[in-house]
């Protein structure tokens, strides 16, 4: 996979892309990152990329020219066009399902904006996806773009140590993940559940499933609305509702 980031602040990406899973993914040649300062594509001598909004108002708006030229140059000569992603509060809410969808692509391109917003022609004529990571405002699109890229890259084949790792993550199954414990079994009187020490894999799996359902019920009950609950799982929920 190839992932491009169009940004005015390329230095923001150095630590994230050069660390942890994203670094390992590059070493395994599962992904290639390119960080492009689209100011370099500005067609005026001062390399300005923003201007005042027509009709007045506060703030500055990103001009279409530098972004259009950057995208067109980066995609010239390629048959398969990338998914061009605009990260903005107006976009669709990002989910694990969307991450899985994007992980099937060969080329992603993020447009990371700043200032008051984008010229609408960027949104209408370049962008294939508008994505929001939540109902709050950030200074720019760099942090959301890195978050989305991280969630996508870890799904690529061979990136994680165990292929089952991401399948068991919260949201991958439609539920929040069950609790985890490691040694020691007794720390300051706080003990690991006996079931996990039993060696009985069937009991352990049932415990994990029940705790996953419980945690989802308590913290994100909205996720259960479309989850195909078994009769036993419905019984558990009924018991918790009556506690």
From Swiss-Prot:
Q: Which family does it belong to?
A: Belongs to the RNA methyltransferase TrmD family.
One GO MF term: tRNA (guanine(37)-N1)-methyltransferase activity
Instruction: Give the gene that encodes this protein.
Output: trmD
Q: Which NCBIfam families match?
A: PRK00026.1, trmD
Quote the HAMAP family the UniProt record gives: TrmD
Q: What Enzyme Commission number(s) does the record list for this chain?
A: 2.1.1.228
Q: What is this protein called?
A: tRNA (guanine-N(1)-)-methyltransferase
Subcellular localization is given as:
Cytoplasm
According to its UniProt entry, the protein's GO biological process terms are: tRNA N1-guanine methylation
Q: Whose protein is this, by species?
A: Bacillus velezensis (strain DSM 23117 / BGSC 10A6 / LMG 26770 / FZB42)
């Amino acid at each position: 996979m190839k992932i491009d980031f169009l940004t005015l602040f390329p230095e923001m990406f150095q630590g994230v892309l050069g660390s942890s899973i994203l670094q390992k993914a590059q070493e395994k040649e599962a992904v290639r990152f390119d960080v492009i300062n689209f100011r370099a594509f500005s067609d005026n001598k001062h390399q300005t990329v923003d201007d005042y909004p027509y009709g007045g108002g506060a703030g500055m708006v990103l001009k279409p020219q530098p972004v259009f030229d950057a995208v067109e140059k980066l995609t010239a000569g390629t048959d398969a066009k990338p998914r061009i992603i605009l990260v903005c509060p107006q976009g669709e809410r990002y989910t694990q399902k969307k991450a899985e969808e994007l992980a099937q692509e060969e080329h992603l391109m993020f447009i990371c904006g700043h200032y008051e917003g984008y010229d609408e022609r960027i949104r209408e004529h370049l962008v294939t996806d508008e994505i929001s990571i939540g109902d709050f405002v950030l200074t720019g699109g760099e942090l959301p773009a890195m978050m989305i890229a991280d969630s996508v890259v870890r799904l690529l084949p061979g990136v994680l140590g165990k292929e089952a790792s991401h399948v068991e993550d919260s949201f991958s199954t439609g539920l929040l993940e069950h609790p985890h414990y490691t040694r020691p079994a007794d720390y300051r009187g706080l003990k690991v559940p006996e079931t996990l020490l039993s060696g009985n894999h069937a009991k352990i799996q049932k415990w994990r499933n029940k705790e996953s359902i419980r945690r989802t019920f308590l913290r994100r009950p909205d996720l259960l609305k479309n989850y195909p609950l078994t009769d036993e799982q419905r019984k558990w929920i009924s018991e918790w509702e009556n506690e």
